[in-house]
Amino acid sequence: MWKFYLSIVLLLTGCIYLKPNQNSMSDLSQKDWAKSIVEHPGAVVLDVRTEDEFESGHIPNALNIDLRKGPGFIDELNALDKNKFYYVYCRSGARSAQAVKVMRDLGFSETYNLIGGILEWEGQTVE
């Protein structure tokens, strides 16, 4: 019987240290992403693709910070206002998901990834 109680105590102790998956709540569909941007004036649209990719076409008013810059990417992020809302995208959604994770680790609280990236973007783009 004591083994049963010990198992319950260990299980509950382990649950204390579990954190919800923050990334699952930061991935937004194109529709929700666009709607949320409108609801947050002053929000920043962040393109984490390379400069060449950015110049080939990007979402209007997007700021380009290349995720592949490594430490330079972190430096540029640290120069941003961590209290703003950030809507992040890349080509397909993979790099932007990584960027959102990095941003949250750096203390940004409102960061959102565009599912499918610019490949699935149906809105306007500029070159």
Sequence positions of predicted segments:
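Short, surface-exposed ligand- or partner-binding patches at beta-edge/loop junctions that are enriched
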Residues: 89
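Rhodanese-like catalytic fold shared by cysteine-dependent sulfurtransferases
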Residues: 2-6, 12-43, 52-85, 94-127
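Structural scaffold elements adjacent to functional motifs in cytosolic proteins
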Residues: 45-47
